[in-house]
Amino acid sequence: MARTTPLERYRNIGIMAHIDAGKTTTTERILYYTGKSYKIGEVHEGTATMDWMEQEQERGITITSAATTAFWRDHRVNIIDTPGHVDFTIEVERSLRVLDGAVTVFDSVAGVEPQSETVWRQADKYGVPRICFVNKMDRIGANFYRCVDMIVDRLGARPLVMHLPIGEESGYIGLVDLLRNVAVIWKDESLGAEFEDQPIPADLVEKAAQYRAQLIETAVEMDDEAMEQYLGGEEPSFEVLQACIRKGTISRTFVPVLCGSAFKNKGVQPLLDAVIDYLPAPVDIPAIKGVKYGTEDEIAKHSTDDEPFAGLAFKIMNDPFVGSLTFVRVYSGVVESGSYIQNTVKEKRERVGRMLLMHANSREEIKEARAGDIVAFAGLKDTTTGDTLCDPTPSSLVVLERMEFPEPVIEVAVEPKSKADQEKMGIALARLAAEDPSFRVTSDVESGQTVIKGMGELHLEILVDRMKREFKVEANVGAPQVAYRETISKAYEVDYTHKKQTGGSGQFARVKIRFEPGEKGAGYVFENKVIGGSVPKEYVPGVDKGIRSAMDNGVIAGFPMIDFKATLTDGAYHDVDSSVLAFEIASRAAFREGIAKAGPKLLEPMMKVEVVTPEDYLGDVIGDLNSRRGQVNDMDQRGNARVITAMVPLANMFGYVNTLRSMSQGRAQYSMTFDHYSEVPQNVSDEIRAKLAG
């Protein structure tokens, strides 16, 4: 089957923004005007086609990125709608990794909001060219020009203004297209499908001329010939200017800024035109880099059907009808349904069952996918997010660069309400963890509890909610906990004899063990220094086993012991009464006695915290970290933001995300990873003991 749409006519784009700026509504309108939806879905009615999970329709927010294909001006546009809530940045990060360009939507009333900054930085990290759409021009307090200023101040970007609004708030009727130098007015009765060109209104003529001159001046920087023509007093042609703007957008020299009101159906068609005119096709961006499987040799995969197949799995979704779906961006080559492919990260062969082209939540079955496509594979068993899929021929094996996923920062215990729920919960959690790499599941050995970890309170709340709805699991959810540890601070030697005589063969074992502090991070070390056979070799493993079984419960508060050394120096045995079990019991008792006298201490997990904050809130952020027993180690500048690195005890980090958001009006963000265990100060240790005893 031949290619139906040439590669240069592909656009793989994401629509990203702060929560509530109108991303999903904008996507809905795009689908409506490109003919994919026959009826417009509204977010506030809970019928938007891109928001297809129940929780999304209820909460009016987008959690997962749904991928959709639409057509406009004979171009194929693959759109990924991404969530704007801070707890779901992982979804945005995944989408940006596989996109070629993005549309950033701003709320014209709020301007550049905190999550817009976060998303913008993520797009910078992946080098994604973008265009800006200033939405909600019909709302009270809408201000297009302030929004443009904020793009400069907060994002450090260079805006290229392409539109000026005509009328504001409820009087918003259309826009001035500066490049074509005309006014575009929408007809309300046609649901925004019809609009017409008119002369620019008299009160805007001067302003439009001024902004148009700026537009041309910025655009011609991209082309020497156009620049000479412009400096010679001649205006370059429309086509030349368009080519200059395209070049500048793709090289990220500037960002075109458009305006409209998606909800009122105005400005969506010019936005679609801009996607096609200015955002890159797969062939316009650098080839994706990877390494040849099993080597360190770097290779590039080009967007062409002629190279062997290579793609990246960027999302796993459970579909109620098809089962597990793996969303894949095909970078090169052709892949057919029913064929075998290699997962080079998991080192497994996979068979592509069915191949689907997704439209939000309906699907179309296809027989093959080619370079540039974003498709869903059904039937993959071992593939998870971030894996490379490629042609199984040995010479074609490649590993594309993986995505980085943040470590979870909050954990809660969950326990099933009944035995039946227990089995279902295991399956549900495994499925959810496969879909979402920022969600982890562990079993706590000490308490036997299942602990789930995620990116924030909303994140875990929604996952527990999905567990209840999709998998029908009833569970109780606990409060967040800290995993403390214990160790010793000085050496102590114990001589302990275990004797038990009850007629017949008894039990006898004598051990002399020296306990001493170990290296940080060394865990538990056991050494046998018995000379002359006072403890026969076959009994020594019993001594080690006894200590190992006792060290799970420390003497202070029953937390596991770490970083100590036990040396067996001497002992005695009895020909008849000694056994491995007797030595195990003796060493266990010696451990309890010795550790209690070796200066036991409580340890707590210390987290390495990195806070990225605008300069204005620097003092407050540092003051707050100090009040949490934190130590600031380093301060750095990143763009127009400050980066603070500090060590803070995990126990003092609960609820930090909310404090930080309110302290910085939501503009600061943080990440936190475990660094090491450190001694708990005496006053805090006493508090913990009292709490556990009480």
From Swiss-Prot:
Compartment(s): Cytoplasm
Entry keyword annotation includes GTP-binding: yes
A biological process from GO: ribosome disassembly
Alphabetized CDD domains for the sequence: EF-G (cd01886), EFG_III (cd16262), EFG_mtEFG1_IV (cd01434), EFG_mtEFG_C (cd03713), EFG_mtEFG_II (cd04088)
GO cellular component, as recorded: cytoplasm
Signal sequence, start to end: none
Top-level taxon: Bacteria
GO molecular function: GTP binding; GTPase activity; guanosine tetraphosphate binding; translation elongation factor activity
Binding residues for GTP: 17-24, 81-85, 135-138
Name of one Pfam family that matches: GTP_EFTU
Family per record: Belongs to the TRAFAC class translation factor GTPase superfamily. Classic translation factor GTPase family. EF-G/EF-2 subfamily.
Entry function: Catalyzes the GTP-dependent ribosomal translocation step during translation elongation. During this step, the ribosome changes from the pre-translocational (PRE) to the post-translocational (POST) state as the newly formed A-site-bound peptidyl-tRNA and P-site-bound deacylated tRNA move to the P and E sites, respectively. Catalyzes the coordinated movement of the two tRNA molecules, the mRNA and conformational changes in the ribosome.
Protein name (database record): Elongation factor G
